[in-house]
Structures are given as structure tokens and as C-alpha cells.
């Protein structure tokens, strides 16, 4: 048990720059390139393609800055990270013969990059919660919101990113149909906020280690099995019925008598047919 605690302490002291940040930028830009029409945008409007890729990479920082009334352009002050993400964007889109993209499209490399990106998600959630706490002391909702925005900002602002590429899909709003990364980030923001308020009997470094291992294992499993659904679905369905299905059940109960009554009544077509047969009998 002590060895596990030591491992979690050392894990919590990992530096995200440069390797984990590079993996995050690589996975984000690869995801941006695989969007419909992304290559056409890159060939006709490189500036729009670059801005779209930067939203994928730094969307969490931009969204959290907007929510805290801070200048969103402050992300540009980190010149080193911007240049690193821009270099990866250029090589993914414009490297001769797509050698860079095809090299990192190799599944084992993509698994490593995706796993490292999930590690950065934990650090982003924590940094968002800490940053929100410095502005609003022990404001739970603010801390959860900023941690959620910092960790899943790229998904939460996906509609704006689509507008940059000239696409408008309001039905793809994350608030209407949350994707797995957005859901699991919200859960992480709640857990780390509770831990920050000492309402969870677990140390921060242990929670970081357990949560990150969960993220990495689920992400790798989903990529290996080519699963696009949420692993939380078996829990979401019964919970939704229990918490939000009451009105739906009442509506079904109200509709059932009318439907059963309708079954007992003869249709208009049947009545017309019967009346026609009776008139024919009279003529005979």
C-alpha cells in the first residue's frame, strides 16, 4: 500500500511539458484533421484550418478565461506552446506525402498519444479548479464549471469550431447530446471539487492516479474495440428513467385508455362497408 502511495505521489509531480503537451496537441490536431471537410479547408484557407486546430488544442483555456471574465487572448502569451502546437498542425496537414500523418496514424502510436492526452485532462481539471478557487473561495459550482471547461473545452465549444470551418450543426451541441469525454470530465470536476473541500476521504495524489488510470484504460479499450458509445450508458438509462421518466410514464398512462377505446370502436371504413352491404341486400 505504501508503494502504491509513493507511485501516486511521484505521478502527481509529473510535468506536462513538453512530452504530454505534445501528445495532447498531436491527438487534438489528428482529431481536427479527421473532421468532414477539414482537408478542403486546409487547402483553401490555411488560416481557418490553423484557428480550428488551435481551438481543439486550447479550447479549454479559452472557454475558462471567458467564463472568468479574463481575456481569452491570454492563451497566446504562452508562445512556446502555441509554436509547438502550430508546428504539429503544419506537419499533420502539409508534410510531404502525408508521411507525418501516416506515421502517427499507426495504432500503437495513436494509443500512446491518446493515453498521454488523458493524463493531461486530469491536470487541466485540477488547474481549472485551483484557478477558480483563487477567484471564488469554496464556490463549488464555479469550481466545477471551470474545471469542466478547462478539461473539456474543445468539446464544449465544438459548435464555434465548426463555424470557423463554415459548418453549422446546432443538433451536435454537447449540451443536447454529451459525448463521453465531456461526461467523464464533468464527473472528474465534481470528484476533485469534493476532494478539494475535504468531502472525499482520499488524498489528492491518490485520486489523481486512480482517475487518470480509469481514463487511460477506458480510452484505450474504446480505441481497440472501435466503440463510439458511452461506457456510462448502462447506468445512464435506468437513472434517466428513475429521475426524469415520471412525466413520460404519466403520459403513457393517459394515452393508454384512449388507445384501448379506439380499438373497441369500428373504423369509418368498416361502417361504410357494412352500410353498403345492407343497401345491396335491400336492392336484392
From Swiss-Prot:
Gene Ontology MF term list: identical protein binding; potassium channel activity
Protein name: Trimeric intracellular cation channel type B-B
Gene, per the UniProt record: tmem38b-b
Activity-regulation annotation: Channel activity is activated by increased cytosolic Ca(2+) levels and blocked by luminal high Ca(2+) levels.
Keywords: Endoplasmic reticulum, Ion channel, Ion transport, Membrane, Potassium, Potassium channel, Potassium transport, Transmembrane, Transmembrane helix, Transport
Stated family: Belongs to the TMEM38 family.
Annotated residues for binding of a 1,2-diacyl-sn-glycero-3-phospho-(1D-myo-inositol-4,5-bisphosphate): 117, 121
Organism of provenance: Xenopus laevis (African clawed frog)
Topology term for the membrane: Multi-pass membrane protein
Record topological domains on the Cytoplasmic side: 33-44, 100-102, 158-178, 226-284
Annotated GO CC locations: endoplasmic reticulum; endoplasmic reticulum membrane
Subcellular location: Endoplasmic reticulum membrane
Assembly and interaction partners: Homotrimer; conformation seems to be controled by binding to diacylglycerol (DAG).
Regions that span the bilayer: 16-32, 45-68, 80-99, 103-121, 140-157, 179-196, 205-225
Amino acid at each position: 500500500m505504501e508503494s502504491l502511495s509513493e507511485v501516486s505521489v511521484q505521478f502527481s509531480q509529473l510535468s506536462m511539458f513538453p512530452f504530454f503537451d505534445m501528445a495532447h496537441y498531436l491527438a487534438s490536431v489528428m482529431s481536427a484533421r479527421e473532421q468532414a471537410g477539414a482537408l478542403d479547408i486546409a487547402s483553401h484557407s490555411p488560416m481557418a484550418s490553423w484557428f480550428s486546430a488551435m481551438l481543439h488544442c486550447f479550447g479549454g483555456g479559452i472557454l475558462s478565461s471567458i467564463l472568468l471574465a479574463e481575456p481569452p487572448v491570454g492563451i497566446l502569451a504562452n508562445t512556446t506552446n502555441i509554436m509547438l502546437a502550430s508546428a504539429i498542425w503544419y506537419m499533420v496537414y502539409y508534410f510531404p506525402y502525408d508521411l507525418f500523418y501516416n506515421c502517427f496514424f499507426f495504432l500503437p502510436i495513436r494509443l500512446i498519444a491518446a493515453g498521454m492526452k488523458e493524463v493531461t485532462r486530469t491536470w487541466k481539471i485540477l488547474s481549472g479548479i485551483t484557478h477558480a478557487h483563487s477567484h471564488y473561495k469554496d464556490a463549488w459550482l464555479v469550481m466545477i464549471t471551470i474545471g469542466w471547461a478547462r478539461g473539456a473545452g474543445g468539446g464544449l465549444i465544438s459548435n464555434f469550431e465548426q463555424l470557423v470551418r463554415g459548418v453549422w450543426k446546432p443538433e451536435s451541441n454537447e449540451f443536447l447530446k454529451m459525448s463521453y469525454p465531456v461526461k467523464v470530465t464533468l464527473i472528474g470536476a465534481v470528484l476533485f471539487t469534493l476532494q478539494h473541500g475535504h468531502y472525499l476521504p482520499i488524498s489528492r495524489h491518490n485520486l489523481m492516479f486512480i482517475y487518470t488510470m480509469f481514463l487511460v484504460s477506458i480510452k484505450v479499450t474504446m480505441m481497440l474495440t472501435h466503440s463510439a458509445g458511452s461506457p456510462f450508458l448502462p447506468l445512464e438509462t435506468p437513472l434517466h428513467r428513475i429521475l426524469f421518466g415520471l412525466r413520460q410514464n404519466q403520459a403513457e398512462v393517459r394515452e393508454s385508455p384512449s388507445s384501448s377505446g379506439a380499438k373497441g370502436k369500428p373504423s369509418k371504413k368498416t361502417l361504410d362497408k357494412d352500410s353498403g352491404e345492407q343497401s345491396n341486400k335491400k336492392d336484392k
